[in-house]
Amino acid sequence: MVGFWQARAAAGTPAGAARWRPTDHGVKLERFAVRPEFRNQEIGGALLKQVLTDVRAKFPDAPVYLNAQLRAVPFYERQGFERVGEQFEEAGIQHFKMVLRRT
């Protein structure tokens, strides 16, 4: 099972996308992206909110985590994620593993 979400601008232009998948460690959020011309318009936050609603409906008690690029860490921290462990490299890009805090 994999979930895929796409955000579109008012004119129907693709603005962003994301997916999630269950793993042995919980539910991993992956491939979050917002096109540069649509950034800083709250699209990423709205997309993340919809993805989390979908994940919680299917896996209400599962831990939710992701690997965030360094530049995205502040965004995910504002959304309730916290860093876990040390910084690491994936595909030549520095990341932190982040886990959604339980509320």
Residue ranges, per PLM feature:
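Hydrophobic beta-strand residues of extracellular immunoglobulin-like
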Residues: 1-7, 66
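Conserved GNAT acetyl-CoA-binding A-motif
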Residues: 55-69
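A conserved beta-turn-beta hairpin within the catalytic core of GNAT-like acetyltransferases
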Residues: 22-30, 39, 58-60, 92-94
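C-terminal "cap" of GNAT-fold acetyltransferases
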Residues: 67-71, 86-103
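Conserved beta-strand in the GNAT
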Residues: 6, 12-21, 28-33
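Conserved acetyl-CoA-binding loop-helix of GNAT-fold acetyltransferases
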Residues: 34, 40-54
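Conserved acetyl-CoA-binding loop of GNAT-fold acetyltransferases
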Residues: 77-86
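Conserved beta-strand segments that form the floor/walls of ligand-binding pockets within enzyme
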Residues: 28, 33, 65-67, 97
